[in-house]
A protein has these predicted regions:
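C-terminal segment of N-terminal export signals and the immediately downstream linker at the start
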Residues: 22-42, 351
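Catalytic active-site module of serine/aspartate enzymes centered on a nucleophile-bearing elbow/loop
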Residues: 318-351
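N-terminal secretory signal peptides and thylakoid transit peptides that target proteins
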Residues: 2-17
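A short loop-to-beta-strand scaffold at the N-terminal edge of the catalytic core in hydrolase folds
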Residues: 42-50
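Conserved HGGG/HGGXW glycine-rich cap/lid loop of the alpha/beta-hydrolase fold
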Residues: 50-96
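Active-site loop/turn elements of alpha/beta-hydrolase fold enzymes
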Residues: 89, 156, 328
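Flexible "cap/lid" subdomain of the alpha/beta-hydrolase fold that forms the substrate-access gate
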Residues: 32-34, 46, 92-128, 132-321
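Active-site helix-initiating loop/hinge in glycosyltransferases
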Residues: 62, 105, 336-337
Length: 351
């Protein structure tokens, strides 16, 4: 794959197009039209949805999701002349689920992406990541710059390694109050809460941090006091907003009923290892063409009270093409919003 500036700009445009959907609210994309392949990478096997031919675009989901979160974007980008690969991240869906917390550190997860590129016979890929998929993509671009042509992060901007581990920072910030990542830290607690009724837990979480859940309890994923019954505190909407259909929820539910939540939750628990193993991330930047896309009502934006974490999204990206913040939308941006304008040009800034 050529690495000329013109080519790289074209690839960035394609990564923006990866977010574009002709999705009509209330419609669901059937699973069966997509082609699936199990690919060995970095000591694990990942189940991937694969469509199209051409330059490689890898779409990386977050918590608690699946390849299916990209169901509205896979085919439009493949039809535009790209080879789109959307894996179930390790720990999820039909991919391998190692038991140890250490198997979910950022070294392992970025290694999975590089291994996918190798296994698919490519030199480079465009990366598009959402939620935890965004740090996986940002960090792969920073750690392996020669392998990544462009990167788009959704929901979570690129943050360099801080002076202390993330969970320590959250503990200092929230004290005795509730913050979801601290709740996830103790093995078995969140697993029991979510696995008691997977469908209800997913339904409540998907609603709570969406744009529709702006005023719902725990929309910020934090509270000034401890919260003992997290799932019980969240609202169960009736009806659910049209961006997630009952068949969509069926698909997510079946996957998590079968695979559980330990692997996905282990990603949060492995953050201390990231800090220990990757000190170079305190200075590395993302030099590839890059952009950031999020919903204006995404709770990630206000994780640090009084600070807009999206304001400096490109601070450590040397070829940053701007942020696109979508009014009225929340955390599940590629499912909540059709981003039709992005197919035309790489964004500078839009609201």
């Amino acid at each position: 794959m050529s690495d000329t500036p013109t080519r790289r700009e074209f690839l960035l445009t394609a990564s923006m197009a990866a977010l574009v959907s002709q999705h009509v609210a209330g419609q669901s994309t059937a699973v069966q039209p997509f082609r699936f392949q199990r690919i060995e990478t970095n000591g694990v096997t990942l189940r991937c949805a694969i469509e199209g031919t051409g330059p490689l675009v890898i779409m990386v989901h977050g918590f608690p999701e699946l390849w299916y979160s990209w169901r509205h974007q896979i085919r439009p980008v493949a039809d535009a002349g790209f080879r789109v690969v959307a894996p179930d991240v390790r720990g999820y869906g039909e991919s391998d689920k190692p038991h140890p917390v250490a198997a979910y550190d950022m070294v392992s997860l970025t290694g999975d992406i590089v291994g996918l590129i190798d296994a698919l016979g490519e030199d480079q890929a465009i990366l598009v990541g959402h939620d935890w998929g965004a740090p996986i993509c940002w960090n792969t671009a920073a750690l392996h710059p020669e392998r990544i042509a462009a990167v788009a992060g959704l929901s979570v901007p690129f943050f360099q390694r801080g002076p202390a581990p993330s969970l320590e920072n959250w503990r200092n910030l929230y004290g005795n109050g509730f913050f979801y990542q601290l709740y996830f830290e103790t093995e078995g607690v969140a697993e029991a809460a979510f696995e008691a009724d997977v469908r209800t837990a997913l339904r409540k979480l998907y609603y709570t941090i969406s744009g529709d859940g702006e005023h719902a309890p725990l929309h910020s994923l934090s509270a000034p006091e401890p919260v003992d019954d997290v799932v019980g505190t969240m609202v169960d909407p009736d009806p659910f907003p049209s961006w997630l259909t009952e068949p969509d929820l069926d698909y997510f539910t079946a996957a998590f009923e079968q695979g559980g939540f330990r692997g996905p939750l282990n990603r949060y628990r492995a953050q201390g290892r990231d800090w220990e193993l990757l000190p170079q991330l305190s200075r590395l930047q993302v030099h590839q063409p890059s952009t950031f896309i999020a919903g204006a009502l995404d709770p990630v934006r206000t994780f640090v009270p009084g600070v807009d974490l999206y304001a400096g999204a490109g601070a450590n990206c040397t070829d940053f093409r701007g942020s696109t913040i979508i009014d009225g939308k929340g955390h599940w941006i590629q499912q909540e919003a059709p981003l039709l304008s992005l197919v035309l040009n790489p964004p500078r800034h839009a609201h």
